[in-house]
Design a protein with these regions (language model features):
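Alpha-helical segment that forms one wall of the substrate-binding/catalytic cleft
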Residues: 5-59, 63-72
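Catalytic and substrate-binding regions of cell-wall glycan-acting enzymes that process beta-1,4-linked
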Residues: 55-106
Length: 106
């Protein structure tokens, strides 16, 4: 049974680490702003720990799903279904990037 909860599907231990690191002791996983901030915090840690650019949607997604240690071990490589989803997430990100570029928001 996973402890993943809220918009970011953050695990209990990782959420506690986030609150300790950021000092946001009142942050809630059920609050979209807090969950979004958590994701930024986690992705920045992933960049530092795993060397994955913030612009690398595919690998950031894989590391978010598998955890930073799981990603480093390559646990996702045995999960073709997950690799396919990560590709779809990256394609969606590229589509949003193009749309934002056209409307002058990027």
């Amino acid at each position: 049974q996973s402890s993943a909860y809220g918009y970011a599907q953050a695990l209990d231990g990782t959420w506690s680490e986030y609150k300790d690191d950021t000092g946001r002791i009142l942050a809630r996983r059920s609050n979209i702003r807090d969950a979004s901030d958590f994701m930024g915090w986690y992705m920045t840690k992933t960049k530092r720990r795993n060397g994955i650019s913030l612009a690398d949607t595919r690998n950031q997604y894989l590391a978010y799903h598998e955890g930073q240690t799981g990603f480093a071990r390559g646990s996702y490589k045995r999960k073709k279904w997950l690799i396919n989803i990560a590709g779809k997430v990256a394609n969606r990100s590229d589509m949003y990037k193009r749309q934002l570029s056209r409307c002058g928001r990027l």
